[in-house]
């Protein structure tokens, strides 16, 4: 699909549903979380509307169009012949669709508004409450609103209620005069993502006619121009990643449980920040960020000030404003044509004003690749790459500016590849090339983190990217079809540099050495052996011979040179002079068996598959084919292996067996995503 293939880029959906006659008199709406793109919607032949963007939610009142005595039909036309980004975006209905039934008097789709405030000692919270209620009935109605807060054990914390208002037919009313007080609140933070449930009830004639539950977090976010970011008074450095929204095997149609899995893999290496590059997020992903304690910069798709563009910005903010994970709204990314001009400054100023109007509790930001003008009039400046932005010069010239790294370079390379294989679309990580010149756009992951770690006034940074993603395969070309910028590959298997970040972003002891020792064809060649670790010192042994003990520099790495010969490499990490960790890699035999690790979130199981030799060692260069079989109600949704040039089919097609499939290992790893798994997933070589 896409602009090169217009004949295959238009798709139609048709779905029937039935309504019970007893529901006649209720109110019905249909909500689409996201359709890529240019989606036109009909119900029973009546046109509802058009949304051009593939990232904006659509909500339609269908009450006057539905039948109770015969089937109803929803028809959707999707046209993906034009892109919105320069990366893989998928096509079609890829997010949830909701049929919403309510009473005629009900809360509007984005009608709940919650803001939390804390006193100086963080011992008392005030929760400012708001609800927009609409009367979609035929008669004038009096109604009131009650709010009840529950803790995460389901216990009632407090209740408040607003006085009654009268609503004419089609009229709306705001119930926003109330405030709750919570003593000794359990605060939301990255380390303690505690969520309360706010229940909002609409009452008419002493009867509850609508109920909405909203997950909320009580927290206070502060930004300081000199000291950085504070959450509930505690200094927090952003350990962030930028992310697109696709995954091996399923593309952009990521199930909710897989969204959680992706965040879990990032948290394992210490990630606490997520930038939704470059579009509003799937609601399920923001829910996952709330529950896992991830700080979010949510990004608008289009930078502009016409009615439609500001409407997109407003839609994102109104939909997502109650999420405690969101700390800032980004108005755009790398607008090369205007970011260095006064025109860009003026547009950013207007959009920033709109952000502050729609949500006075959070700052605006924008990501610039080189032009300083566009960041002048937003609340927080976002710099894409220290190699492209004179960050320190801007600091000297504008000392009151709050700033962070909205994008920073990773090593860029293929998992498990240590010698370039360009014809086959795979490359060794750029992270390991000699130190580059200051004006080079290529930056080592290590140099980037040192820069941000050493400057308290910078909030932190978001690396490009957390996961590999489809498209934008540069600097490679076909057969490479995936980017290789990820810290984790397309499945979430860690590349070596993931352990660099884990060393400095977590308190967990880390010792990781590479490359693997299955370097067939490179016998007799000198090899650089690296260690990522947060130990004080590391000693390296190659085939039993010590190459010396070295002191680990802060936020750095260690390296030794050795001539490659099959055998064994061992590293010993020391803390306070005592042996703490030992890591061993050795030349292995062929893959003889498989190890599986299953992660279950809701109805989704992600099964990671690893190749082992007869001795139980991980075979880091295995590319064998694996047969997969599931049973019962389980279905295979997709498979992957992290190979950026893999051209095989990734999921069963319509009409094919969804319980048997094959996948090739890539450098020892593969993955299968299963729905409704209640049995063991069988895998075999």
Where are these regions (language model features)?
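Beta-strand-rich structural segments
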Residues: 129-133, 148, 201, 527-533, ...
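Extended acidic/polar, glycine-enriched regions
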Residues: 67-69, 130-224, 559-567, 575, ...
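Solvent-exposed serine/threonine-rich low-complexity stretches and specific carbohydrate-binding patches
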Residues: 48-49, 157-170, 545-553, 637-661
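Short S/T/G/P-enriched beta-strand
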Residues: 223, 506-528, 534, 585-606, ...
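Extended substrate-binding grooves/exosites of carbohydrate-active enzymes
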Residues: 46, 51, 96, 102-104, ...
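Short flexible loop/turn segments that cap and initiate beta-strands
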Residues: 140-146, 159, 190-197, 534-536, ...
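Short, hydrophobic beta-strand segments
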Residues: 62-64, 177-188, 559-564, 655-678
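Accessory beta-strand-rich segments of carbohydrate-active enzymes
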Residues: 3-115, 136-137, 152-153, 280-283, ...
């Amino acid at each position: 699909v896409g602009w090169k293939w217009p004949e295959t880029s238009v798709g139609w959906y048709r779905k029937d549903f039935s309504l019970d006659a007893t529901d006649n008199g209720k109110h019905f709406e249909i909500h689409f979380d996201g359709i890529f793109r240019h989606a036109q919607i009909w119900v029973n032949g009546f046109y509802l509307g058009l949304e051009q963007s593939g990232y904006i939610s659509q909500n339609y009142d269908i009450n006057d169009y539905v039948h109770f005595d015969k089937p109803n039909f929803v028809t959707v036309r999707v046209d993906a012949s034009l892109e919105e980004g320069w990366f893989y975006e998928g096509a079609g209905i890829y997010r949830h669709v909701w049929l919403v039934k309510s009473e005629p008097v009900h809360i509007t789709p984005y009608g709940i508004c919650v803001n939390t405030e804390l006193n100086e000692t963080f011992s008392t919270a005030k929760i400012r409450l708001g609800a927009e209620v609409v009367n979609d009935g035929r008669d004038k109605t009096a109604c009131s609103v009650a709010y009840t807060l529950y803790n995460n054990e389901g216990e009632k914390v407090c209740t408040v209620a607003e006085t009654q208002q009268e609503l004419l037919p089609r009229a709306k009313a705001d119930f926003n005069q109330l405030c709750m007080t919570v003593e000794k609140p359990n605060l939301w933070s990255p380390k303690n993502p505690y969520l309360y449930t706010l229940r909002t009830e609409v009452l008419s004639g002493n009867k509850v006619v609508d109920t909405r539950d909203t997950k909320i977090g009580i927290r206070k976010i502060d930004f300081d121009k000199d000291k950085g970011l504070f959450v509930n008074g505690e200094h927090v450095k952003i350990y962030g990643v930028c992310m697109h929204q696709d995954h091996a095997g399923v593309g952009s149609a990521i199930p909710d449980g897989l969204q959680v899995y992706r965040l879990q893999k990032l948290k394992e290496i210490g990630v606490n920040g997520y930038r939704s590059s470059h579009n509003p997020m799937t609601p399920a992903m923001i829910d996952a960020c709330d529950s896992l304690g991830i700080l979010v910069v949510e990004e608008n798709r289009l930078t502009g000030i016409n009615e439609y563009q500001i409407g997109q910005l407003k839609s994102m903010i109104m939909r997502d404003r109650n999420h405690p994970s969101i700390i800032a709204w980004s108005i755009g990314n790398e607008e090369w044509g205007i970011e260095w001009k006064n025109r860009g400054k003026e547009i950013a100023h207007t959009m920033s004003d709109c952000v502050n109007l729609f949500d006075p509790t959070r700052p605006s930001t924008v990501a610039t690749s080189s032009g300083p003008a566009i960041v002048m009039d937003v609340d927080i400046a976002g710099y894409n790459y220290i190699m492209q932005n004179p960050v320190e010069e801007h600091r000297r010239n504008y000392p009151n500016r709050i700033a962070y790294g909205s994008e920073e370079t990773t090593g860029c390379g293929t998992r498990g590849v240590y010698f370039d294989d360009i014809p086959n679309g795979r490359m060794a990580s750029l992270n390991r090339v000699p130190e580059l010149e200051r004006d080079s756009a290529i930056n080592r992951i290590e140099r980037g983190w040192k820069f941000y770690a050493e400057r308290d006034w910078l909030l932190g940074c978001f690396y490009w990217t957390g996961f590999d993603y489809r498209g934008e395969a540069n600097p490679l070309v076909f057969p490479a079809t995936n980017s290789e910028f990820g810290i984790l590959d397309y499945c979430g298997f860690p590349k070596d540099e993931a352990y660099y970040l884990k060393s400095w972003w977590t308190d967990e002891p880390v010792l990781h050495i590479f490359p693997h020792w299955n370097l067939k064809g490179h016998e007799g060649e000198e090899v650089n052996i690296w260690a990522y670790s947060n130990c004080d010192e590391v000693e390296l042994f190659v085939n039993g011979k010590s190459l010396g003990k070295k002191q680990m520099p802060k936020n750095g790495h260690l390296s030794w040179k050795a001539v490659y010969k099959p055998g064994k490499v061992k590293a010993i990490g020391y803390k306070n002079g005592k042996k703490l960790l030992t890591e061993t890699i050795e030349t292995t035999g062929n893959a003889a068996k498989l190890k599986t690790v299953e992660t279950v979130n809701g109805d989704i199981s992600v099964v990671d598959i690893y190749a082992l030799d007869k001795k139980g060692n991980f075979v880091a260069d295995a590319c064998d084919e694996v047969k997969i079989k599931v049973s019962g109600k389980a279905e295979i949704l997709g498979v992957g292996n992290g190979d950026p040039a893999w051209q095989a089919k990734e999921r069963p097609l319509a009409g094919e067996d969804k319980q048997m499939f094959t996948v090739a290992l890539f450098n020892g790893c593969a993955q299968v995503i299963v729905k409704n798994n209640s049995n063991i997933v069988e895998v075999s070589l």
